[in-house]
């Protein structure tokens, strides 16, 4: 990988800034701006006193303007366990560790609760960040030294992208669906992946995949009589967004015994049951590869799902954000659009929305908030309403848009960055596969724990066969048994995982979700801590 010469880069930026400052000093209007005058001590005291009086008056009021009784009840109903109680406890422990290092049997909090790769040490892809840097600070493109610091293809790509942005400014608003040239690149990437045409006008760029999911829920749900079929266990975004928009989650249970299989008979059963209760089921959500379950659907299974949606008149919501995260040789990712087109289904046969994000895969750019949804099979008048919803949000952020285009159009053979890009990509994915295998094997060695094969995504979802005494202890604390286990695990080891009850599960079963994202050199220590804790827990509560 090319070494980035820090000193040269700093000098380059400083030179550019000095030129800009010299330019601004020559502008006559600068002298017209009055100097900032800080308030005097007396005025500060007056402001503070007035503020305190106002607050006291407000506090003494018998009627507060906002209470839990007066806010939208749908907000109270929605929950997001991935950042719930366990994480709140972890954050308090992390703060306390700064001043009370000897108070706990661990020296750090290890967050295995959320798919946030770079927070746990994963490095970004160099080519992606070079292009972002050049697009964000365009003055670098005018410096001769830039060619010694950045790859030639990142410079070329940055110029190409900037030419497509109004005013060549990444701080400007874009078209509500996203910059047209970037949507062209994404459509080309989809076509290269699937072997079927993709239309840039079907692409709606979003701040990660989550806003796209919310947008579709808002579009499809009119009342609690509208239902969305969701996999159980499910990613809490779905239950939360359905609750927030006032709909009904219609569960279909994945079969843990068959590696979290998706059975069409289960879909039919739950659909018929919902309809018998007067619920109009509008859509089927499928997460592939699975979150939190980590399974990868077979192409044959996907064909059955497509047929089911076609026969029942359901919108297929395909959450495909982990499409790059497949770790076993006998499984391969196939997009639902590719499967549908290979079956002969065209635009008029199936309403399909596919979601992609820059947060997952091998890139892990969660904080950049980039993603898109590809919307196909909707009538023109409905598409106009989707566009209107996108317009209300003005546009997604430009850096996220750029990244979304880059993950779908990375360096190709012969490009200056290709070899380093492939080395970084393969290094990350192969390491994730090793971590997944190590954790899977360790979990299956624990007493009363079973864990399905980690085929893809970023998670393991082991089943806890807890002793009755542990279940009774949890009931005494008025909490779910898996939540009880996870809290004890956190306080004993500093390891943060998410209780399975936060994802929903077959009644009477208990699980937790654990990411495979801590850096590879930390995995052995995590295994040791987890093993020691679990043995102690079972010794304490064994029937």
From Swiss-Prot:
<dbReference type="GO" id="GO:0030170">
    <property type="term" value="F:pyridoxal phosphate binding"/>
</dbReference>
<comment type="pathway">
    <text>Amino-acid degradation; L-alanine degradation via transaminase pathway; pyruvate from L-alanine: step 1/1.</text>
</comment>
<dbReference type="GO" id="GO:0005739">
    <property type="term" value="C:mitochondrion"/>
</dbReference>
<keyword id="KW-0007">Acetylation</keyword>
<protein>
    <recommendedName>
        <fullName>Alanine aminotransferase 1, mitochondrial</fullName>
        <ecNumber>2.6.1.2</ecNumber>
        <ecNumber>2.6.1.-</ecNumber>
    </recommendedName>
</protein>
<keyword id="KW-0663">Pyridoxal phosphate</keyword>
<comment type="pathway">
    <text>Photosynthesis; C4 acid pathway.</text>
</comment>
<dbReference type="Pfam" id="PF00155">
    <property type="entry name" value="Aminotran_1_2"/>
</dbReference>
<feature type="binding site">
    <location>
        <position position="173"/>
    </location>
    <ligand>
        <name>pyridoxal 5'-phosphate</name>
    </ligand>
</feature>
<keyword id="KW-0032">Aminotransferase</keyword>
<comment type="function">
    <text>Is the major alanine aminotransferase in roots that catalyzes the conversion of alanine to pyruvate. Involved in the rapid conversion of alanine to pyruvate during recovery from low-oxygen stress.</text>
</comment>
<dbReference type="GO" id="GO:0071456">
    <property type="term" value="P:cellular response to hypoxia"/>
</dbReference>
<feature type="transit peptide" description="Mitochondrion">
    <location>
        <begin position="1"/>
        <end position="55"/>
    </location>
</feature>
<dbReference type="GO" id="GO:0019481">
    <property type="term" value="P:L-alanine catabolic process, by transamination"/>
</dbReference>
<dbReference type="InterPro" id="IPR015424">
    <property type="entry name" value="PyrdxlP-dep_Trfase"/>
</dbReference>
<feature type="binding site">
    <location>
        <begin position="354"/>
        <end position="356"/>
    </location>
    <ligand>
        <name>pyridoxal 5'-phosphate</name>
    </ligand>
</feature>
<feature type="compositionally biased region" description="Low complexity">
    <location>
        <begin position="43"/>
        <end position="63"/>
    </location>
</feature>
<feature type="binding site">
    <location>
        <position position="322"/>
    </location>
    <ligand>
        <name>pyridoxal 5'-phosphate</name>
    </ligand>
</feature>
<feature type="modified residue" description="N6-(pyridoxal phosphate)lysine">
    <location>
        <position position="360"/>
    </location>
</feature>
<keyword id="KW-0496">Mitochondrion</keyword>
<dbReference type="GO" id="GO:0009058">
    <property type="term" value="P:biosynthetic process"/>
</dbReference>
<dbReference type="GO" id="GO:0005634">
    <property type="term" value="C:nucleus"/>
</dbReference>
<dbReference type="GO" id="GO:0004021">
    <property type="term" value="F:L-alanine:2-oxoglutarate aminotransferase activity"/>
</dbReference>
<dbReference type="GO" id="GO:0001666">
    <property type="term" value="P:response to hypoxia"/>
</dbReference>
<keyword id="KW-0808">Transferase</keyword>
<feature type="binding site">
    <location>
        <begin position="209"/>
        <end position="210"/>
    </location>
    <ligand>
        <name>pyridoxal 5'-phosphate</name>
    </ligand>
</feature>
<keyword id="KW-0809">Transit peptide</keyword>
<feature type="binding site">
    <location>
        <position position="397"/>
    </location>
    <ligand>
        <name>pyridoxal 5'-phosphate</name>
    </ligand>
</feature>
<dbReference type="GO" id="GO:0005524">
    <property type="term" value="F:ATP binding"/>
</dbReference>
<feature type="modified residue" description="N-acetylserine">
    <location>
        <position position="56"/>
    </location>
</feature>
<feature type="binding site">
    <location>
        <position position="235"/>
    </location>
    <ligand>
        <name>pyridoxal 5'-phosphate</name>
    </ligand>
</feature>
<comment type="similarity">
    <text>Belongs to the class-I pyridoxal-phosphate-dependent aminotransferase family. Alanine aminotransferase subfamily.</text>
</comment>
<dbReference type="InterPro" id="IPR045088">
    <property type="entry name" value="ALAT1/2-like"/>
</dbReference>
<comment type="subunit">
    <text>Homodimer.</text>
</comment>
<feature type="binding site">
    <location>
        <position position="291"/>
    </location>
    <ligand>
        <name>pyridoxal 5'-phosphate</name>
    </ligand>
</feature>
<feature type="region of interest" description="Disordered">
    <location>
        <begin position="43"/>
        <end position="64"/>
    </location>
</feature>
<dbReference type="InterPro" id="IPR004839">
    <property type="entry name" value="Aminotransferase_I/II_large"/>
</dbReference>
<feature type="binding site">
    <location>
        <position position="369"/>
    </location>
    <ligand>
        <name>pyridoxal 5'-phosphate</name>
    </ligand>
</feature>
<dbReference type="GO" id="GO:0046686">
    <property type="term" value="P:response to cadmium ion"/>
</dbReference>
<dbReference type="InterPro" id="IPR015422">
    <property type="entry name" value="PyrdxlP-dep_Trfase_small"/>
</dbReference>
<dbReference type="InterPro" id="IPR015421">
    <property type="entry name" value="PyrdxlP-dep_Trfase_major"/>
</dbReference>
